[in-house]
Amino acid sequence: MSRKQLALFEPTLVVQALKEAVKKLNPQAQWRNPVMFIVWIGSLLTTCISIAMASGAMPGNALFSAAISGWLWVTVLFANFAEALAEGRSKAQANSLKGVKKTAFARKLREPKYGAAADKVPADQLRKGDIVLVEAGDIIPCDGEVIEGGASVDESAITGESAPVIRESGGDFASVTGGTRILSDWLVIECSVNPGETFLDRMIAMVEGAQRRKTPNEIALTILLIALTIVFLLATATLWPFSAWGGNAVSVTVLVALLVCLIPTTIGGLLSAIGVAGMSRMLGANVIATSGRAVEAAGDVDVLLLDKTGTITLGNRQASEFIPAQGVDEKTLADAAQLASLADETPEGRSIVILAKQRFNLRERDVQSLHATFVPFTAQSRMSGINIDNRMIRKGSVDAIRRHVEANGGHFPADVDQKVDQVARQGATPLVVVEGSRVLGVIALKDIVKGGIKERFAQLRKMGIKTVMITGDNRLTAAAIAAEAGVDDFLAEATPEAKLALIRQYQAEGRLVAMTGDGTNDAPALAQADVAVAMNSGTQAAKEAGNMVDLDSNPTKLIEVVHIGKQMLMTRGSLTTFSIANDVAKYFAIIPAAFAATYPQLNALNIMRLHSPDSAILSAVIFNALIIVFLIPLALKGVSYKPLTASAMLRRNLWIYGLGGLLVPFIGIKVIDLLLTVCGLV
């Protein structure tokens, strides 16, 4: 579930952004953006010149200088406004999160158990390791792990999802988040963070972006823009002696206007806004990124590790067939399978019970009346079952049952091996059922591949992204599902160590890897991956290891995360192309106007046939300011994104933003020149 999206130009945000734009006129704020700092200095210089001209202290056209000065200030203000609007949208999202963080008291237990004596303390004084009790109606005061109890928890304030979730001690559902509310029962929680370090605190700090650090690509682009600015600054400085030597020195106001129009002010004014907006779009998808670096890395990812269950398949495997071993009838197998599944509350376990009912009218037995001992599934044993009336029935993976049979002095039948292979080749998961040391047969669990997922993987392949399916299934089952889903590769019988080794292998090849995870056993791989999306429903260890948290706990979101990252990089690249292409058109407007009096041959460059030198220069400066405003929606929303190969994407962007960057200024400057002339302003 995504959060409610703010309108692009929300009136309250626009008003606040205008105020912030004025505040950002101070030198300290401007210094952070070297390109716009040059414009700020030019604005200050031309303001002083126009005042001197108006007072008679300097010769020249005071009105023209004042007009140039005014539009240079407007250019700075528009750049400030773009950044302030992006920050304002993020802060509005942060304010909604701050509403969750309430000052409250907590019941700090003196001993780590329910019923122990408790002290009432302010929630913001709780430290890592403190034990607290929360009951129905209470706000959970800190991030932590449930060490006792189980409760229904409303996490809508954090995730936006209205359905309550169960949090209980043990397993992967023991992690709780401060600011969420207990709906029923009680929990004893051990705080896992100190004040100011909670998940909610980190969300607010990230969203507000007050300490937002530039990403590597952003730093590289800033260095390029500074280099271009220095080149144009030196070029402009040398033009004054050339014009003076020709006998008609160009005014400082015109030189400043020329410099501002030539340096890449468009991308310089929008660069910060693009970065802030990228993180804001990620939050709009209900994904919290720890830094802009993580969002940027998502755009460079070329390997996706995707869990099979829930991402590639629907995740609710259903029993579809009972396949008895040689000498065993199907009803005997179904009866044993149903008994072994009576206490199994997983979707797979319930489907086995239902299939036995449907096929052989085997009604579900009363668990209490059986006087049986149920054996739960564990990651170590990889099987579950029941002990009843001297019968020991188990169901589980092929390898686990094989070890169990051999440990009990039995022999695993060759015909069952063949049946297991047959089930696996069909893309189903085989579960083997055994009674004592006698193998009864195989249950086929069919998992359904999601509709349209094959087409999405084909699009990712076009973009040069390799998809790898991660599954605990055996190789035959994994190969069948991988072929059906259209992934490029797969890792079968995956263990945490195997995932980690696979990530390191791809990284050694120079690739960037993205993955999702939710369990403590995923933490090492999440920490190693370049883009690691932890599920909000997962453990604290997983969330700390990842550099993003998906509030919806939807593994499929990884594809959307990559989409947003690539869109941010494309937006930055497209607007940089547009900005640099702009300079060519402005060159044709200003150079003839500024130097035609000294060098008449330059009139040949006046292909736009602008009204006069003054109108040409002023039109270029006005266009330079207005284009920033027109591009703000594109910077905030991102450019249109289509899954294409790198070369096709480059060609498309060069046509749209390169050619567009050349043509738009020619048209815009000419229109502004006509308006100035018609209105008699020049």
Curated annotation (Swiss-Prot):
Documented EC number(s): 7.2.2.6
Gene Ontology annotations for the cellular component aspect, listed alphabetically: plasma membrane
Membrane topology: Multi-pass membrane protein
Keywords recorded for this protein, A-Z: ATP-binding, Cell inner membrane, Cell membrane, Ion transport, Magnesium, Membrane, Metal-binding, Nucleotide-binding, Phosphoprotein, Potassium, Potassium transport, Translocase, Transmembrane, Transmembrane helix, Transport
Gene for this chain: kdpB
Alphabetized Gene3D superfamilies for the sequence: Calcium-transporting ATPase, cytoplasmic domain N, Calcium-transporting ATPase, cytoplasmic transduction domain A, HAD superfamily/HAD-like
Subunit: The system is composed of three essential subunits: KdpA, KdpB and KdpC.
Name used for this protein in its record: Potassium-transporting ATPase ATP-binding subunit
Annotated organism of origin: Escherichia coli O7:K1 (strain IAI39 / ExPEC)
Catalysed reaction equations from the record: K(+)(out) + ATP + H2O = K(+)(in) + ADP + phosphate + H(+)
